[in-house]
Amino acid sequence: LAAEVKGCLLISHNRIEIMWVSDRVTVLRKGKCIGTVETANTTAEGLSAMRVGRNVSFHVEKGPLKPGGEVLSVEHRTVASKVHKNNAVKKVSFQVRRGEIVCIAGIDGNGQTELVYGLTGLEPLVSGELFLCGQDITHTSIRKRSTMGMSHIPEDRHKHGLVLDYSLEDNMVLQRYFEPEFTDKAGFLRRKNIRGYAERLIEQYDVRSGQGPVTMAHSMSGGNQQKAIVAREIDKDPELLVAVQPTRGLDVGAIEYIHRQLVAQRDEGKAVLLVTLELDEVMDVPDRIL
């Protein structure tokens, strides 16, 4: 279109796309115009600093790899596709150990979603076995997998990560509301405890919301919705963290934050399974790539 002498307005926060496509960039932050620069006269790092108000590191700092025992074992697993009425994943086997980040990479639509659905219990397996910390979880429920030490940052935060019409504090205890800390013996929610727990996570994980724990999830930005999910899943102190496209649609500041949280889990001796389509993420974050 530009070659045909037509004007194009591109709205994006993908730094690669911006640097590749645009001729001139205007940066907005918190509703204000920060500045306009010629793309040829700036860098991705410079644009990122304008966008978030500070320097952002694109390099993921990790300590030396010290893998421990096996946490997740997937043996000859087959998962069906509801869309194509065939097996999207056929006889897949792999393991994830403590203290490492393992990445499943590939072009979208090649079985990653079905693989994760089978792993987390969202869809049943056609065949194969799953073991978490040596225990067979092949046919266990989603709640059971969660209480056994599996956390899941889902691909679609609106469909599987949050209840958008719930408050932030209610979303923070979606998988733990039945615990004695949050529900009394008569079955009533301990609202004071839930509020205190949510306030702690909001502060600890820098989740920004207009009304704190009573903020409705649908009113939050995508980045802060994702931070809330990350806070909830990591605070469960999981043995295995399954993170599926955890930085999709996020700005560079939120991406940096998510990467640091994944690496922190790895450095604490947790097992992390990362599923992503982002090439930079594939090359920078994991210790092994499948």
List each model region and its residues.
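Glycine-rich phosphate-binding loops of nucleotide-dependent enzymes
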Residues: 1-290
